[in-house]
Amino acid sequence: MARYFRRRKFCRFTTEGVVEIDYKDIATLKNYITESGKIVPSRITGTRAKYQRQLARAIKRARYLSLLPYTDRHQ
């Protein structure tokens, strides 16, 4: 069986020098939620703990203000 090369995880916010994650930046936040609307864990994205907490807080604020949906579809 062949072993696949795993891409190295890195924190995008650290490399870009982001001070604080903004809840109004919907394009960035959408990269960190699944199709069903769940927040993607840091062990998958590689985000540092400090930024993962800010990310979760920003996503929850955006959901509360109806900028992001809580789920994908209500049926």
Curated annotation (Swiss-Prot):
Gene3D superfamilies assigned to the protein according to its UniProt record, in alphabetical order: Ribosomal protein S18 (4.10.640.10)
GO cellular component: cytosolic small ribosomal subunit
PROSITE patterns attached to this UniProt entry: RIBOSOMAL_S18
GO molecular function: small ribosomal subunit rRNA binding; structural constituent of ribosome
UniProt-listed GO biological process terms: translation
Lineage: superkingdom: Bacteria
Keywords carried by this UniProt record: Ribonucleoprotein, Ribosomal protein, RNA-binding, rRNA-binding
Claim: Cell wall biogenesis/degradation is one of the keywords in the record: no
Complex formation: Part of the 30S ribosomal subunit. Forms a tight heterodimer with protein bS6.
NCBIfam families from the UniProt entry: S18 (TIGR00165)
Family: Belongs to the bacterial ribosomal protein bS18 family.
Function: Binds as a heterodimer with protein bS6 to the central domain of the 16S rRNA, where it helps stabilize the platform of the 30S subunit.
Stated name of the protein: Small ribosomal subunit protein bS18
Source species of the chain: Sodalis glossinidius (strain morsitans)
Gene (UniProt): rpsR
